[in-house]
Curated annotation (Swiss-Prot):
UniProt key word Thylakoid: no
Binding site for heme b b562: 84, 183
Gene: MT-CYB
GO molecular function: metal ion binding; ubiquinol-cytochrome-c reductase activity
PROSITE patterns on file: CYTB_CTER (PS51003), CYTB_NTER (PS51002)
Membrane topology of this protein: Multi-pass membrane protein
Subunit composition and interactions: The cytochrome bc1 complex contains 11 subunits: 3 respiratory subunits (MT-CYB, CYC1 and UQCRFS1), 2 core proteins (UQCRC1 and UQCRC2) and 6 low-molecular weight proteins (UQCRH/QCR6, UQCRB/QCR7, UQCRQ/QCR8, UQCR10/QCR9, UQCR11/QCR10 and a cleavage product of UQCRFS1). This cytochrome bc1 complex then forms a dimer.
Protein name: Cytochrome b
Family affiliation: Belongs to the cytochrome b family.
Binding-site positions, a ubiquinone: 202
Any one Pfam family match given in the protein's UniProt record, by short name: Cytochrom_B_C
Note: Heme 1 (or BL or b562) is low-potential and absorbs at about 562 nm, and heme 2 (or BH or b566) is high-potential and absorbs at about 566 nm.
Cofactor annotation comment: Binds 2 heme b groups non-covalently.
Residues annotated for heme b b566 binding in this entry: 98, 197
Length: 380
């Protein structure tokens, strides 16, 4: 009998073992769709980004007008740009839901997979930040100025580091050029890290909603989950195309329709919606270095999840106390996102400070206590 090329060819064999014959737990829910959706988001962002890069000029005098030219004069340039800008928002929606699912179902106990995932999140955040600077509008320029300036809070080397990042004494042409280079490079780094992430995942196999070993009941990925993922894809593309075609600027800042002007500061400098929770935590601390440390901690705290797991059960499916805390944390993040979009005045300052405190308190103290308490209640 002739060998099946899918199983014998050195390259196809790898694809087969990852996407076709991959043994998958039979009970994984729709929450497990977001991994493949993130892969599709990345592919789409790289393709649309590549097409945009062919028409973009990384120069302070030309960047703004080159983006306008893309939207006005290039065939479907407006569509490519709208898909790219809003695709970033959907990328973050998917990654936040993906992390939330991992947190709820205890997927962080696969430490290598979880840690590479957190590194992926950090790389994605860096990519989105440098990308937001490229259109060289007012919010692009001032966002770049404010966020890069945070590095000056680092003792002793801070100021040198900032000027090195800027390539001068302020955000100017060298900054834009290097940000474009980074924005082009980082998505490919994300693609490479994704392969590492998947390699670690396929070492252990997927987790499942019950959090139990599922070796006794696994089914092939294709056709069951490939079809399920296509359904997820259509449900992602529908709101994305709706947003890109009907209201492409809904999530953007009107300030970015004004070309960058170093002499005029916008009344409210704020990042895109997906960074607002971290921005609110940064602003809630009056000290500059303290704010920067809290900002870094708000994301780096994810690395501690495996260490803070005290429950004998893996998932939160049968842990009502932890469930309550999980949804409190979700509401807390939504409050932080809202506060981050508001001006720095009463009552938003105190709300932001309380929400920031609750965020860290819940993750670092309440979750481990709840896990230990649930063990005790179940006589473990």
């Amino acid at each position: 009998m002739a060998p099946n090329i899918r199983k014998s060819h050195p390259l196809l064999k790898m694809v087969n073992n990852s996407l076709i014959d991959l043994p998958t737990p039979s009970n994984i829910s729709t929450w497990w769709n977001f991994g493949s959706l993130l892969g599709i988001c990345l592919t789409m962002q790289i393709l649309t980004g590549l097409l945009l890069a062919t028409h973009y000029t990384a120069d302070t005098t030309l960047a703004f007008s080159s983006v306008a030219h893309t939207c006005r004069d290039v065939q479907y340039g407006w569509l490519i740009r709208n898909l790219h800008a809003n695709g970033a928002s959907f990328f973050f929606i998917c990654i936040y839901l993906h992390i939330g699912r991992g947190f709820y179902y205890g997927s962080y106990l696969y430490k290598e997979t979880w840690n590479t995932g957190v590194i992926l999140l950090l790389t994605l955040m860096a990519t989105a930040f440098v990308g937001y600077v490229l259109p060289w509008g007012q919010m692009s320029f001032w966002g770049a100025t404010v966020i890069t300036n945070l590095f000056s809070a680092i003792p002793y080397i801070g100021q040198t580091l900032v000027e090195w990042a800027w390539g001068g004494f302020s955000v100017d042409n060298p900054t834009l050029t290097r940000f474009f280079a980074l924005h082009f490079l980082l998505p490919f780094a994300i693609a490479g890290l994704t392969l590492i992430h998947l390699t670690f995942l396929h070492e252990s196999g997927s987790n499942n909603p019950l959090g139990i070993v599922s070796n006794c009941d696994k089914i092939p990925f294709h056709p069951y989950f490939s079809l399920k993922d296509i359904l997820g894809l259509t449900l992602l593309l529908l709101p994305l195309t709706t947003l890109a075609l009907f209201s492409p600027n809904l999530l953007g800042d009107p300030e970015n329709f004004t070309p960058a002007n170093p002499l005029v500061t916008p009344p409210h400098i704020k990042p895109e919606w997906y960074f607002l929770f971290a921005y609110a935590i940064l602003r809630s601390i009056p000290n500059k270095l303290g704010g920067v440390l809290a900002l870094a901690a708000s994301v780096l705290i994810l690395f501690l999840c495996p260490l803070l797991h005290k429950s004998k059960q893996r998932t939160m499916a049968f842990r009502p106390l932890s469930q309550l805390l999980f949804w409190t944390l979700t509401a807390n993040l939504l409050i932080l996102t809202w506060v981050g979009s508001q001006p720095v005045e009463h009552p938003f300052i105190i709300i932001g400070q309380l929400a920031s405190l609750t965020y860290f308190f819940t993750l670092l103290i309440l979750f481990p206590i709840a896990g230990a308490l649930e063990n005790k209640l179940l006589n473990y």
